[in-house]
Amino acid sequence: MNILFAGGGTGGHLYPAVAMAERLEQLYPGTTVAFVGTERGIEATEIPRLGYRLHLLDVRGFRRGFSFSDMLNNAGVLLDFVRAVVKAAGIIRAEQPDVVVGTGGFVSGPLLAAAELMGRKTLIQEQNAFPGVTTRFLAAFATEVHLSFEESRKFFRRKQGVFVTGNPARSFTGIDQAEAQSFFGLQPGLPTLLVFGGSRGARSINNAVKTWISGAAGKANIIWQTGSLDDERLRKEVEPSATLWIGPYINDMRMAYGAADLVLCRAGASTLAELTNLGKASVLVPYPYATGNHQFFNAKALVDAGAAELVADADIALDQSRTKVFSILADPELRLRMREACRKEGRPEAALDLAGRIAGLANIK
């Protein structure tokens, strides 16, 4: 069975594809997996590191404005898209995939379009409650569309071939907390806060956490993924310690989640899938410029379930936000209630279910 995945730009689009690929390889030995991405996305480094073959397309997104500059840019984007579809068709002829799977990001569009024009079986996996424009358009022609939220159905005209299977997430279970804390050089036994804002980082979160370090010393461990955007600056301003690990990227998220009692992060759908599958208490800071404000709606679902707290991006630097975070970190009973509520929202079998659907499309039993 040959499967070709397209998805990336950010971890939110890439890691669901990786989760499905890993499960396919576990369930169906001999499966061949390849990826299509861009050189600007996280996939350019992550996919080779994971040992998969990667094809690159040159594609970028449309601007949403109506100025002359925006329209000129979008004309170029459209031309790039057509060229990318032609190149994607060549990749499909070379790989001969049984199924082409798209998980979002700019690169999914041309590969899915080429696959659908060539009559290949296609599966779209949408992570967010508010599907993107490309997903909604290509879904009309896809063999199957898989959603993470029931409420997303209303955005699609078609009724057949649309399923709610959840968001496939990487598996991070089976880690002893004290071992994980020691892995980061931290003090076992202290409550531990895990902070991250994506591969590039979140400047608002980084600036807030920088002011929290001195007050947390001796009371809590902090594992802080700064992202590439602020790494150089923060390394000059903040020193690691026995209670602080700081770095641009965490290569072993299994250990990071295993060490954490509370997670402070954005509210991307893939991150929330990982949190709910693990049952991790969290304070969510939705990215305010996400399309359709979808991170807010992703976060609200967990907040309404009692599984998380929400802090607006504009408020993260306020004293009350710091107080909220460290109050939860210091309250084991509250964290337990949040963990239990969070686990109820998870769909840990999503990767398994989707692997089965992909195999079914490939006529593999």
From Swiss-Prot:
Binding site for UDP-N-acetyl-alpha-D-glucosamine: T10, G11, G12, N128, R170, S199, I250, Q295
Bilayer topology: Peripheral membrane protein
Enzyme class: transferase
Membrane-spanning segments: none
One GO-annotated biological process of the protein: lipid glycosylation
Record pathway: Cell wall biogenesis; peptidoglycan biosynthesis
Principal location listed in the UniProt entry: membrane
EC number(s) reported in the record: 2.4.1.227
Localization annotation: Cell inner membrane
Catalysis performed (reactions): di-trans,octa-cis-undecaprenyl diphospho-N-acetyl-alpha-D-muramoyl-L-alanyl-D-glutamyl-meso-2,6-diaminopimeloyl-D-alanyl-D-alanine + UDP-N-acetyl-alpha-D-glucosamine = di-trans,octa-cis-undecaprenyl diphospho-[N-acetyl-alpha-D-glucosaminyl-(1->4)]-N-acetyl-alpha-D-muramoyl-L-alanyl-D-glutamyl-meso-2,6-diaminopimeloyl-D-alanyl-D-alanine + UDP + H(+)
Keywords from the UniProt entry: Cell cycle, Cell division, Cell inner membrane, Cell membrane, Cell shape, Cell wall biogenesis/degradation, Glycosyltransferase, Membrane, Peptidoglycan synthesis, Transferase
Presence of keyword Transferase: yes
HAMAP family for the chain: MurG (MF_00033)
Record-stated family: Belongs to the glycosyltransferase 28 family. MurG subfamily.
UniProt function note: Cell wall formation. Catalyzes the transfer of a GlcNAc subunit on undecaprenyl-pyrophosphoryl-MurNAc-pentapeptide (lipid intermediate I) to form undecaprenyl-pyrophosphoryl-MurNAc-(pentapeptide)GlcNAc (lipid intermediate II).
PANTHER family hit by this protein: GLYCOSYLTRANSFERASE, UDP-N-ACETYLGLUCOSAMINE--N-ACETYLMURAMYL-(PENTAPEPTIDE) PYROPHOSPHORYL-UNDECAPRENOL N-ACETYLGLUCOSAMINE TRANSFERASE 1
Identification of the protein by name: UDP-N-acetylglucosamine--N-acetylmuramyl-(pentapeptide) pyrophosphoryl-undecaprenol N-acetylglucosamine transferase
Native source organism of the sequence: Prosthecochloris aestuarii (strain DSM 271 / SK 413)
Organism classification: Bacteria, Pseudomonadati, Chlorobiota, Chlorobiia, Chlorobiales
Chain's gene name: murG
